[in-house]
Each structure stands twice: as C-alpha cells, then as structure tokens.
Amino acid sequence: MGVTNPDKVISNTPGVVDPATSVPAWQDDAFFRQATDQLADKGFVLTTVDDLINWSRTGSLMWMTFGLACCAVEMMQTSMPRYDAERFGVAPRASPRQSDVMIVAGTLTNKMAPALRKVYDQMPEPRYVISMGSCANGGGYYHYSYSVVRGCDRIVPVDIYVPGCPPTAEALLYGILALQKKIRRTGTLDR
C-alpha cells in the first residue's frame, strides 16, 4: 500500500508560484523569509507579537465593496480569475463588521456621504480605506457639480489613493499591495 516509486513523490513543493517571475510567492515576504531562516537554523522562531499580528493581518485583508460608479466594474474584475486578488490574501466581504478595508470606487454625492461615514464607523479597528478612481479621489469629471463631494477624504480618512478614470485592475492590485506594505511598516499597535 505504500509508495512503490519514491522518485515520483514530490518532496519539496514550491507552493504558490508567481507566474510573472516563476518564483515562489513567499520569497518576497521578508517576515516569512526571516522566520523560515530562523526555524532552519535554530529550530524555533523569536519575534514580537506586533510583527506576528502585522504579518497575519496583511495576508488576510477582507475588503468591503463600496462601488458607486463605473470604477466598481474594475474593482469586481480584480476578483475574477485573470487577476485573482485572493492569491494576495485579499477577499471581498459584504458586511462592514467583517471587513478591514473599504474600497470607495466612484462618485461620492452629498446624499451618500453620511451613509459612507456610517459604514466606515461600523468597521472594526484597525480599518483602512482605499480611494479608487478620480471621482473618489477628488470629484473627477463631476468636480464642479453642487451635489458631489470633492474627494472621499473629506468624509473618511484615506490610506491609499488609486488614480485613473477608471483605474485598471492592475492599479487596484498595486494599491492593495501598497496597503499591505503600509500595514507592515506602521504596525497595528501604533496606529
């Protein structure tokens, strides 16, 4: 019942491989690389709780969709198989109480601003906001309209701005990766 040919058994799989570079995805993570080096040298890992929390938080960001206009189509595209945002540890959630990141995509009107703030207040700490597209960043095409908020940063604090009209799915993924780097850099206890 055992393995008859041990040459056919894969002993050391590379894990998730980045298709662009053909390098395992975990090799880009400095914390993970340091932990595996310590584990290989000593047999155990020493770290601070803050570093461990930051590492786990960056790999499990749950984003809530707040799609207001055409940018929401590009936001949905990041979850599709071509870009697959979940390979970076980011997954969509429908409830603000279960999400860490809110992506504001599209034109924010004065009537929608209180609802945006209410949803933001329902998110647990630490919470992050990505402003996606020209309309969410500064009003965009409708900047001079009486009914448009000239940037969602007037309502909620924004961590990452993704420019474009509409920004591509690659730009949003770059913004998500920039947010992950920001979380690693600033920490959760210091925020």
UniProtKB/Swiss-Prot annotation:
It is an enzyme of class 7 (translocase). GO terms for molecular function: 4 iron, 4 sulfur cluster binding; iron ion binding; NADH dehydrogenase (ubiquinone) activity; NADH:ubiquinone reductase (non-electrogenic) activity; quinone binding. It is found in: Cell inner membrane. Keywords: 4Fe-4S, Cell inner membrane, Cell membrane, Iron, Iron-sulfur, Membrane, Metal-binding, NAD, Quinone, Translocase, Transport, Ubiquinone. It holds the Pfam family Oxidored_q6. [4Fe-4S] cluster binds at C70, C71, C135, C165. It comes from the Bacteria. It is a peripheral membrane protein. NDH-1 shuttles electrons from NADH, via FMN and iron-sulfur (Fe-S) centers, to quinones in the respiratory chain. The immediate electron acceptor for the enzyme in this species is believed to be ubiquinone. Couples the redox reaction to proton translocation (for every two electrons transferred, four hydrogen ions are translocated across the cytoplasmic membrane), and thus conserves the redox energy in a proton gradient. Belongs to the complex I 20 kDa subunit family. PANTHER family: NADH DEHYDROGENASE (PTHR11995), NADH DEHYDROGENASE [UBIQUINONE] IRON-SULFUR PROTEIN 7, MITOCHONDRIAL (PTHR11995:SF14). This is NADH-quinone oxidoreductase subunit B.
